[in-house]
């Protein structure tokens, strides 16, 4: 078949597809504007936003946050909710665990008066509510807390001790098949909080796994493994927070396996000032000598807590450091891209010389 004949055949096929399934059912990827634009919601931790590679969690996708107990999963999800609301968006929280603390959510920055909450009786109801909210197109982010608490209706109606093999996995697989396309169409972000379990009889390798079967792993665009790696001590040696490490276990939108560390303070949530300090020191924007932190010719304070308080007071300094961190990251990315292009060019020259 000649090139003109192939072109006419393709045009006829496209015309027939659009007649059968509607205009826009098939198109050139370059003309599909949403393929180039990724809307994001900030996580509240600048180090994590940078590790994700796109500046936050993407809208229109499924996100999974998993980790052990008291590792900051709900805190991270609530920060994303608060940031979505600050952008003028609408957020919904499906509290299957019946454990959301409205006072703590408000302390973090969530507007609890506008936050929609649902506490369904069974997993099917929870996932149906999430799908209906997403289908409305009026909700920007939906949090499901947690997958482990999504109990199938038949399990609720049965007796304690009854064996229900694969019920939850089948329920999740069926729901996610419907939910994925709806989220993409309405540009809604769905965040699933998940717990970890240990597989019995695993002698080698990692025995940890997440609940709900394999479907969520496949459908998630981003999976974040969140862990507590230490305590933050305050005055009189009392714990005032936790040091958290997040590994991006899966990322369809940027390179995966990057890590980020940040502080979660008990009465504050994620410390944005702490993230700025860590990144500014790492990028040599702030000079750390001993216990003193200096910025240009100015002493910021002695000790990390003193600098944190200074940044919380001085918003202009906070924004200036944040801007310089972004500039440093962009410069590093441009340098890495230029280096990769030079390497590729050198390889092509070497191949041509053979």
Swiss-Prot record:
The keyword DNA damage applies. It is found in: Cytoplasm. Its main location: cytoplasm. Disulfide bonds: none annotated. CDD domains: RecA. GO terms for molecular function: ATP binding; ATP hydrolysis activity; ATP-dependent DNA damage sensor activity; damaged DNA binding; single-stranded DNA binding. Keywords: ATP-binding, Cytoplasm, DNA damage, DNA recombination, DNA repair, DNA-binding, Nucleotide-binding, SOS response. SMART domains: AAA (SM00382). One of its GO terms (cellular component) is cytosol. Pfam families: RecA, RecA_C. PROSITE patterns: RECA_1 (PS00321), RECA_2 (PS50162), RECA_3 (PS50163). Transmembrane segments: none annotated. SUPFAM superfamilies: P-loop containing nucleoside triphosphate hydrolases (SSF52540), RecA protein, C-terminal domain (SSF54752). One of its GO terms (biological process) is SOS response. Can catalyze the hydrolysis of ATP in the presence of single-stranded DNA, the ATP-dependent uptake of single-stranded DNA by duplex DNA, and the ATP-dependent hybridization of homologous single-stranded DNAs. It interacts with LexA causing its activation and leading to its autocatalytic cleavage. Belongs to the RecA family. This is Protein RecA. It comes from Chlamydia muridarum (strain MoPn / Nigg). The lineage of its organism: Bacteria, Pseudomonadati, Chlamydiota, Chlamydiia, Chlamydiales. The gene is recA.
């Amino acid at each position: 078949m000649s090139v003109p004949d192939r072109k006419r055949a393709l045009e006829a096929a496209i015309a027939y597809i659009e007649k059968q399934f509607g205009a826009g059912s098939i198109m050139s990827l370059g003309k599909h504007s949403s393929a180039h634009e990724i809307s994001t919601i900030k996580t509240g931790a600048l180090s994590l936003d940078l590790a994700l590679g796109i500046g936050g969690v993407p809208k229109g996708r499924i996100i999974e946050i998993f980790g052990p107990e008291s590792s900051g999963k709900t805190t991270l999800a609530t920060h994303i909710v608060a940031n979505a609301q600050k952008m003028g968006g609408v957020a919904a929280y499906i509290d299957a665990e019946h454990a959301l603390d409205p006072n703590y959510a408000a302390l973090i920055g969530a507007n609890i008066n506008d936050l929609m909450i649902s506490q369904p009786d069974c997993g099917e109801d929870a996932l149906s509510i999430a799908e209906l909210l997403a289908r409305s197109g009026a909700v920007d982010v939906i949090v499901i807390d947690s997958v482990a608490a999504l109990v199938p209706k038949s399990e609720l109606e049965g007796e304690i001790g009854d064996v229900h093999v694969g019920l939850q996995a089948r329920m999740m697989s069926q729901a996610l098949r419907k939910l994925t396309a709806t989220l993409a169409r309405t540009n809604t972000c769905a965040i699933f909080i998940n717990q970890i379990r240990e597989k019995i009889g695993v002698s080698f390798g990692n025995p940890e796994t997440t609940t709900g079967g394999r479907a969520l792993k496949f459908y998630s665009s981003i999976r974040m493994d969140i862990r507590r790696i230490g305590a933050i001590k305050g005055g009189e040696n009392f714990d005032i927070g936790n040091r958290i490490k997040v590994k991006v276990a899966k990322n369809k939108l940027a390179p995966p396996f990057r890590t980020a560390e940040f502080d979660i303070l008990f009465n504050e949530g994620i410390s944005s000032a702490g993230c700025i300090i860590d990144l500014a020191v790492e990028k040599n924007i702030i000079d750390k000598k001993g216990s003193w932190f200096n910025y240009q010719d100015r002493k910021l304070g002695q000790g990390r807590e003193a600098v944190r308080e200074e940044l919380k007071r001085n918003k202009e300094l906070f924004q200036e450091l944040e801007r310089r961190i972004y500039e440093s990251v962009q410069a590093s990315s441009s340098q890495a891209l230029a280096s990769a292009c030079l390497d590729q060019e050198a390889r092509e020259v070497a191949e041509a010389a053979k």
